[in-house]
Amino acid sequence: MNAGNDPLFIVDDFEVEELPENMDMIESITVLKDASATAIWGSRAANGVIVITTKKGKANDFKISYSNNFKVSAKPNFDDLHRANSEQIIDYDREAHLYGYNSMMGGFGYEGSGYSLSQEILNDYWEDVIIDWETGAVSPMDPQKLAEMDARLNKLKAYSNRKQIEDYLLRNAFRQQHMISVSGGTDRVNYFLSGSFIGGHSEYVGDQERSYNINSRISYKLLHNLTLRSDLSATFDNNDNGYTNLSNDIYNLFPFQMLVDEAGNRIADYTQFSRMDADKYTQEYGYLSFGKNLLDEIDMANNTTKNTDYKARFGLDYRVIEGLNLSADYQYERYQSINKDIQSINSYGVRELINQHTVIGENGLSYRIPKGDILDHSQTDVEAWTMKIGATLNRNFGADKQHYVNATAGFEARSKHTTTESYRKLGYNDQTLSWSPIDAIDLATNGTTPPWSSNPMRYYASSYDKFSDILNREISYYLSAVYTYDNRYTVSGSLRIDKSNLFGVSDKYRRNPIWSFGANWNIKNEKFFKCDAISALMLRASLGLTGNFDRSGRTSPIMVGQFISSDLVDGGGYMRITTPPNPLLRWERTRSINLSVDLGLFDRINTTLTYYHNKGYDLLGEAQLDPTVGYSEQLINSADMNNSGVEVQLDADLIRTRDFTWNVGWVFGYNENKIIRNSAHDSSPVLNRVHGTTRFVEGYSREGIWSYRWAGLNEMGLPQAYKADGTKVTTYEDLTVEDLEYSGTYQPKYSGSLSTGFRYKNLQANFLFTYNFGHVFRVEYPDMNPFGSSPALNERIADRWRQPGDEAKTDVPAICSDMMNYLMTYQTGASELAQYSSNSIRKGDMIRLREILLNYDLPKKWLRNSPVKRLSITAQLNNVWLWTANKEGYDPEAVSPVSGTFSLTDPIAFTCGVKLDF
């Protein structure tokens, strides 16, 4: 569960972390799910295996091919975030101000804390709202002052930065791919040579991607029974990352915060101070500017990443006798990634850091962080090798060749050595490659107290200087065999033993045996079966055991620590424990049973029905510990889970003539899982369940969502929840796990796709629909914190409770008008009750038109007098249409299902391309 649930990718018989970026390199893709098919691939096969075969050269088939595609995506639609507009946020701040919250705090913010333009206006009037501290009563503002304040606020309401964001910060994402290949061969040599380029940019202004790849695949027939294979590739990436915080900063812009004024001059956003406070420190004392403008940040960004990836693979195939082959393969990979981020002294982040550690002395300002640029440098190096030695027997025997045997045995060893280093240089000069030293110990222990703060600000230089060295080694032994009699009865079996150094020195925990057994019955080939309408009929069954483990380093049988080179007290070194020891760490294991029926009708319809049941045990989960032992939580083997379902796959040629075909493909899946054991202790089960941090609740789905039972708003506009006995409470602190409601699972129970394709002569059209049903998700509620609004406020604040009686027509809580009540009760879980209530749950059912694809092959007669043998033109649309069951039309795939946070949906995208064969 926590060891990962991604499938295993196998490319040309070797395990890889990612799929090839250029799909034109791929010859075929096969998905393996049943136990007999996946057990042979080892520990990560518990989540399924995707086997990819890339293109090779063919004898006497010389070919030059070129392909390209260009993809353009629409700009992001920020309406998907459902943020409040300027008027809604300002009205919200104004109401909180009139209730006295601003006055109670002496202003929405304090010097150096940061506040918005609307709060900056309201801060000018905080003394005009008088609070009776004995009764909590708030006096109304003087009408003249109120009118003056409203006039300033109304002017601000008219501003909206949406168009400026779209014009200056966003663009249509673009990506292009080009590939050229030469392939062919003779009776002794086959070759496939290719080169490709990928370039483009994201939807955010400032970044740029460039990637180059060359590949050589050659096989040499050294002897009549001995073949040498080589596969060499190199990839070079050179990327400009731009201003990497741009998307996050856009999210955090208040809608009335403009980027430029009417004359086109850039406007600074004073996120730390009001303009008045900022001017005081810059003009009177000489501090660096406290303003920030995203256009400036984009212009100053100097953040690059360079990646190189070299792979060399060599293999030998030796045919001992007819049907018996030996093979040996070795792959070596060297990968390096270097990131260099030079942050200008004029960028906001550098100015902020320098200002925080600048003190006013008798002789002016003293800079404890040197004035200059900052260099953040990181480098990752990976050296990996894989060796495989195996034997394969593939024979038919018997008088009528009725017996068929395919057996494979082999050995595999893998090693992956990863080193990383990162460091920061302050006062950096890229021209002279120089930097300035700092008093790191004093900055970390004593820090600096700037004049706008009563607390010291500390700078931990050691947190930027990191080094790591990780070595993973795995060894595997495997054996598999398939026997078929008369093309009717088949039995198969496999055994694999995996060992990993991640489990310490004890062979008891290092070794992971994996096995499978399967049987097939091809009924169609039985002599008694006489039905011409049924073109295929086969029964299949398999069972097996697979395993998985956490490769991320979050758990270990031995203690893992990080050496800190400088102690803050005496300057010496010390060891920080990063992973506590888990001497009982074991592999995650999965027992699988698969039953399938393959049915073909009239040589036009093919369908497969599969039932599977998987039992996972010793699954890794977060266990909360007694803090007195030194750790609050640890990843341990703590849970068992059942996972079962049904899959149906149908392909049908409804119409099939020489010039016209119409085919339909349908995939349907039903899946449900249930935790059947959990030995981990949960010290805060109520909050952890509703927040989704507790996944192992016995008797329920791993992806279950828990909620407070919604009881509506009370007469003061406060959210309420039901206890199990029906009583109402206004704070989660009065609730236990028995009071919670199980809302369902965010993992779809029913999912699949429907595809249909038409071909008329050389023109093809395909449509792909995907669907998900039987799941739920949570939607975002406004955070009703009256002490200053956030740019991420949900637009539903406009529907909040405002007066008695509103509780009958809205479910959005009020800004509590009684400060005393707020301080005593409302702030303790008021927004929590609403956000994580059953009222925030929506159905996740959806149908999406994922893809429309058109392809046209030029008739060969048009190319008869040209060197081009084939020319194909493709056009494709993605993310075309969406239907959802929830009434608001929220895209379930663009919402965090547990927290309800909205994200941007995938925009519609258009792709076109050309393929040519010479």
Give short role names for the model-derived ranges.
Residues 295, 349-353, 358-360, 772-872:
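Extracytoplasmic gating/loop element in the C-terminal half of outer-membrane beta-barrel translocons
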Residues 239-260, 678-682, 885:
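Low-complexity intrinsically disordered tracts that form flexible linkers/tails across taxa
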Residues 6, 211, 217-226, 232-236, ...:
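Extracellular/periplasmic, surface-exposed regions of secreted and cell-surface proteins
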Residues 1-215, 220-222, 227-229, 235, ...:
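Short, small/polar-rich motifs associated with maturation and membrane association
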Residues 121, 126-183, 188-194, 267-319, ...:
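Outer-membrane beta-barrel transmembrane strand signature
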Residues 80, 87-102, 275-297, 345-369:
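A subset of solvent-exposed loop/turn segments in beta-rich extracellular surface proteins, enriched
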Residues 65-156, 414, 421-430, 656-746, ...:
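Conserved small-residue
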